[in-house]
Amino acid sequence: SYTNHDIEMIPIYTFYSMFGFQRVMDLIWAAGDSQSRGFLIGATAGRTTLAGEGLQHQDGHSHLLASTIPNCISYDPTFAYELAVILREGLGRMHEKQENIFYYITVMNENYKHPAIPKDCEKGILKGMYLFKEFNNKGKIKIQLLGCGAILREMLAAAEILSKDYGVDFDVWRVTIYNELRRD
């Protein structure tokens, strides 16, 4: 709309993440080629989120497809504050800075408690990774765990058990998207 009619709009298109890129990839490429701006929201993403239709309908590949489009910025947030930071940045880049990019963001349908935003994590959220939690027992081993999207909560539960029962130390890194880490 901004190119043809000089009307600024930031559209939001929500689709089933498992099928979205498979079924409309040509249109997504056309959107990239025509310098479209907006948000694609891939709903019920991930391999561990609640899937009402079984394993065959779980999305484990849409971010790989998104990585092939140069002006598509993709994210896989786990918490509401991450989504808020990403949306604010996206609106700023597309509307205020007039960048010809669009965003692909996957979301989940699990109901869980969301933590407060950690101090000074916004830059890490946008770059693709930030330190989320440390487990320090002064053990001999310290493991670096990287978690993205739906699997993060399960990874935190495993880290709690290993830390408490076995004295293993961890740094838990919250990866909001591997694609942006690769680009960097």
Task: Annotate each language-model stretch with its function.
Residues 71:
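Glycine-rich, acidic/polar active-site loops that bind/position phosphate-bearing ligands
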Residues 13, 41-43, 74-78, 106-107, ...:
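General beta-strand structural signal in soluble alpha/beta enzymes
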Residues 11, 77, 115-118:
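Proline-rich intrinsically disordered, low-complexity coils
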Residues 1-68, 82-88, 91-184:
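Thiamine diphosphate
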